[in-house]
Curated annotation (Swiss-Prot):
Promotes cell proliferation-dependent organ growth. Takes part in the AXR1-dependent auxin signaling pathway that requires ANT during organogenesis. Belongs to the plant organ size related (OSR) protein family. InterPro entries: ARGOS/ARL/OSR1. The chain crosses the membrane at residues 70-90, 94-114. Its main location: membrane. The gene is ARGOS. Residues 65-116 are annotated as: Organ Size Related (OSR) domain. Disruption phenotype: Reduced aerial organs mainly due to changes in cell number and the duration of organ growth. When associated with ORS1 disruption, reduction in organ size. It comes from Arabidopsis thaliana. It is a multi-pass membrane protein. GO terms for cellular component: cytoplasm; endoplasmic reticulum; membrane; nucleus. Induction: By auxin and ethylene (1-aminocyclopropane-1-carboxylic acid (ACC)). One of its GO terms (biological process) is regulation of cell population proliferation. This is Protein AUXIN-REGULATED GENE INVOLVED IN ORGAN SIZE.
Length: 130
């Protein structure tokens, strides 16, 4: 009986120790939760400017467009804007020519849903390509 009481007291002491340890950990967690990770507005604006300037540099490198290609693009844009205003309207194409894109689309839909002519259709599809 005396042994049981001493073991019981040890268990109570162990429970109290673990409770106090958990409480210390909770206080540390609560202190971290209350901390604000926000920096000053000036610092965040500088970081934002830095990230935008880095993105601009990555999007358009210095040697992406040569001078000749830039002139070509400007000339093409100008011709697409000016020529429709200057040239007379063209007559409509023949009716049969208008059916060509529709025929191509119908052919592609038929080919997409057509079953394959593979003799052994029970095998795994991926093993045929590997």
């Amino acid at each position: 009986m005396i042994r049981e009481i001493s073991n019981l007291q040890k268990d109570i002491i162990n429970i109290q120790d673990s409770y106090s340890n958990n409480r210390v950990m909770d206080v540390g967690r609560n202190n971290r939760k209350n901390m604000s990770f926000r920096s000053s507005p000036e610092k965040s604006k500088q970081e934002l400017r830095r990230s935008f300037s880095a993105q601009k540099r990555m999007m358009i490198p210095a040697n992406y467009f040569s001078l000749e290609s830039l002139f070509l693009l400007v000339g093409l844009t100008a011709s697409l804007l000016i020529l429709p205003l200057v040239l007379p309207p063209l007559p409509p194409p023949p009716f049969m020519l208008l059916l060509v894109p529709i025929g191509i689309m119908v052919l592609l839909v038929v080919l997409a849903f057509m079953p394959s002519s593979h003799s052994n259709a029970n095998t795994d599809v991926t093993c045929n390509f590997m």
